[in-house]
């Protein structure tokens, strides 16, 4: 993401829990407020990876807190520097909708009722107050991100390379996916085009069933 933004001409500062290990301009989370007067736009993708470990009660709490707390830090920093940042592009996920069977879903569909849906709804709720400070808020409900050298695909191919991969259950589950490069392109579009506002589904036009994806 940072590489794509720089290529497009943006001056990027990365926010990290370990800025000393980032090979580019970076600050810690406690420096976000101080950096805000020099900031025109914010892209907030922060959150613990979903696939790293079992979903124990503690792990679920960490998944939610890492997203909600980071977003609150950003919005609080925006509130402390009114009139500076013009747009916040905040990540969410298609998990917002929960299990919906074969029903098509657009951005007006309500949140689901499972854990991921609740987590996404709380994540988004933490971002919307930035609108109170004349900031255009774009919430990207991102699908499963695929790329040749990382993203979800990197973890998915491991069991297949070991000869034990296969579909999940019936394999009828829909998977809304998006290529990593398209996520970058969508973020760039959201930053530069004021027509982007509110929730936006960040997925490829045609989802696939799990059985078809695993066969591919």
Where are the predicted features?
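N-terminal Rossmann NAD(P)H-binding glycine-rich loop of SDR-like oxidoreductase domains
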Residues: 1-10
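NAD(P)H-binding glycine-rich loop region in Rossmannoid oxidoreductase-like domains
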Residues: 20-73
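Catalytic helix-loop patch of NAD(P)-dependent Rossmann-fold dehydrogenases
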Residues: 65, 69, 101-139
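Conserved Rossmann-fold NAD(P)-dependent oxidoreductase catalytic core, especially the SDR/UDP-sugar
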Residues: 72-114
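NAD(P)-dependent short-chain dehydrogenase/reductase
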Residues: 121, 130-139, 143-175, 180
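Mid/C-terminal beta-alpha module of Rossmann-like enzyme folds, strongest
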Residues: 193-216
């Amino acid at each position: 993401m940072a590489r794509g933004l720089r290529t497009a001409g943006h001056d990027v500062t990365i926010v990290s829990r370990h800025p000393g290990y980032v090979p580019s301009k970076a600050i810690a989370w406690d420096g976000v407020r101080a950096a805000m007067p020099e900031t025109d736009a914010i892209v907030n993708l922060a959150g613990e990876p979903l696939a790293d470990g079992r979903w124990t009660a503690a792990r679920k709490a960490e998944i939610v807190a890492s997203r909600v707390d980071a977003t609150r830090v950003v919005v609080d920093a925006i509130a402390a520097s009114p009139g500076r940042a013009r747009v916040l592009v905040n990540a969410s996920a298609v998990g917002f909708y929960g299990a919906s069977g074969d029903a098509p879903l657009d951005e007006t569909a309500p949140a689901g009722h499972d854990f991921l849906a609740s987590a996404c709804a709380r994540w988004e709720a933490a971002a919307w107050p930035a609108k109170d400070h004349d900031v255009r808020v774009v919430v990207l409900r991102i699908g499963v991100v695929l790329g040749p050298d990382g993203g979800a695909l990197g973890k998915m191919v491991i069991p297949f390379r070991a000869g034990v991969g296969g579909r999940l259950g019936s394999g009828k589950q829909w998977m809304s996916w998006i290529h990593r490069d398209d996520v970058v392109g969508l973020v760039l579009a959201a930053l530069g085009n004021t027509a982007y506002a509110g929730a936006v589904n960040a997925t490829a036009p045609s989802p696939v069933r799990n059985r078809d994806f695993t066969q591919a």
